[in-house]
Regions:
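Short amphipathic alpha-helix with an adjacent loop that forms part of the alpha/beta core around
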Residues: 131-134
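Short catalytic micro-motifs in class I SAM-dependent methyltransferases
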Residues: 143-147
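Conserved S-adenosyl-L-methionine
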Residues: 77
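A short glycine-rich, Lys/Arg-flanked "PGG" loop and its adjoining helix->strand segment in the class I
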Residues: 154-166
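A conserved beta-strand element that flanks and buttresses the S-adenosyl-L-methionine
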Residues: 140
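Class I (Rossmann-like) S-adenosyl-L-methionine-dependent methyltransferase catalytic domain
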Residues: 1-70, 80-128, 148, 152, ...
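Short, well-ordered alpha-helix to beta-strand connector turns
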Residues: 93, 136, 164-165
Length: 239
């Protein structure tokens, strides 16, 4: 690749992450009192209405039932901590980490720390996680990888795999989705405007994870036929 092309690619990537940061800063500002203004019951009802929440929680429960020795975990790109809180509801976790690149988002969670048992929040970069290899028995990264620039996807998967000791639970936007063209050309531009959404093939992801010494354990989506769903949650077990 010519030097000018590399330069253009790097500039395009920097602009992408700048737009992502601005998007989530605005989102954080809009939700600054998310936990403070809600009772536990109202919060639970609101989360259960979200399209993927049942998939998230049932997948987590299946992991925990299959291995009774999981005692620590990390929620990477935790945002304001919705799923971090879900992890903390399981008393077996002695240590939970929530990490996000934007302090404004997890500050929403920190304001109500009583809702997060055995949990600490840190600011950090998914592409350069500040943890030793195999630090966490369960690593979770949900509703995030579609915001990672296509040139950084391999690096993101490597970092998530590197810090994982047992199980990695991740979500992707699926290139094998049956209505992919309609979704990417019509629906997403209206929702995200100038913010690109990067999708990935579950089949290619499975091969990549095998190279990182992980095998597919669970696959669930937001439609009946999982592998053709737009949003996919995959759990990989280290071998």
């Amino acid at each position: 690749m010519k030097r000018s092309n590399v330069y253009d690619s790097e500039n395009e990537k920097k602009l992408h992450y700048k737009n992502v940061k601005n998007y989530f800063k605005k989102s954080a500002a809009d939700k600054c009192g998310f936990y403070e203004l809600k009772s536990e019951e109202k919060l639970e009802r609101e989360l259960k209405k979200r399209s993927m929440w049942k998939v998230y929680t049932s997948t987590l429960n299946e992991i925990l039932k299959s291995d009774l020795n999981i005692s620590n975990g990390i929620d990477v790109a935790c945002g304001m901590g919705n799923f971090t809180r879900e992890l903390s509801k399981h008393k077996r976790f002695q240590n939970i980490i929530g990490i996000d690149f934007l302090k404004e988002t997890f500050d929403i969670a920190i304001k109500t720390k009583n809702k997060f048992l055995n949990t600490s929040f840190f600011q950090g970069d998914l592409l350069n996680l500040p943890f030793k290899d195999s630090s966490f028995e369960l690593t979770v990264c949900l509703n995030t990888l579609h915001h990672i620039h296509k040139n950084d996807f391999l690096k993101a998967i490597y970092e998530l795999s590197r810090v994982t000791k047992k199980y990695l639970m991740i979500e992707i936007r699926n290139k094998n989705y049956i209505f992919y063209s309609w979704k990417t050309k019509i629906v997403l531009p209206r929702l995200y405007k100038d913010l690109p959404i990067y999708s990935n093939s579950i089949f290619k992801l499975n091969k990549l994870m095998e190279k990182n010494n992980f095998k597919l354990k669970i696959l669930r989506g937001n439609s009946v036929i999982s592998f053709s769903s737009w949003r996919l949650v995959a759990v990989y077990e280290k071998f």
